[in-house]
């Protein structure tokens, strides 16, 4: 079933609001490479509870960053596993938004910040947990 433009816009606003929050985070090592960035984002991600999850679910987010490690503009969901139900997709969109909130203002090195500022970056989150029997 297709979602209305209003539903999509509302979810985008939720993602934007959560991702721009200045939530405190644990001290992290400076991020100097794309591999470091991916590891930092994955460390912030907590998949939905098992009862709301789907084994193998994938969700890809398109985002860009400022030089200082803050998100630039609002991130967009560009892919979600097709076989998931709308409730499962929603649970994963919320989990990704919360991950971006937890990762608000990443500690980029000056060189890395200069290199990636304003550039599009995609990150795919994969739920590789196994569903209990």
What are the functions of these language-model segments?
Residues 1, 14-17:
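N-terminal targeting leaders that direct proteins to extracytoplasmic destinations
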Residues 1-10:
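Bacterial N-terminal signal peptides that target proteins for export
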Residues 10-13, 69:
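Domain-scale selection of a single, long terminal region
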Residues 19-22:
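N-terminal signal peptide c-region/cleavage motif recognized by signal peptidases
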Residues 25, 39-46, 62, 66-83, ...:
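Conserved "boundary/linchpin" sites in short secondary-structure elements
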Residues 28-35, 86-94:
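Soluble non-cytosolic domains of exported or imported proteins
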Residues 48-54:
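Charged, well-structured alpha/beta interaction segments
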Residues 55-60:
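Short, small/polar residue-rich loop motifs at catalytic or cofactor-binding pockets
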């Amino acid at each position: 079933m297709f979602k209305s433009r209003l539903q999509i816009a509302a979810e985008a606003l939720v993602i934007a609001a959560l991702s721009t929050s200045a939530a405190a985070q644990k001290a992290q090592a400076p991020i100097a490479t794309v591999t470091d960035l991916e590891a930092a984002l994955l460390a912030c991600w907590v998949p939905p509870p098992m009862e709301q999850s789907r084994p193998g679910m994938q969700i890809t987010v398109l985002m860009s960053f400022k030089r200082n490690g803050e998100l630039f503009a609002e991130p967009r969901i560009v892919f979600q596993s097709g076989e998931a139900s709308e409730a499962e997709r929603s649970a994963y969109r919320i989990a990704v938004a919360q991950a971006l909130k937890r990762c608000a203002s990443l500690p980029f090195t000056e060189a890395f910040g200069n290199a990636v500022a304003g550039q599009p970056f995609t990150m795919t989150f994969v739920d590789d947990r196994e569903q209990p029997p």
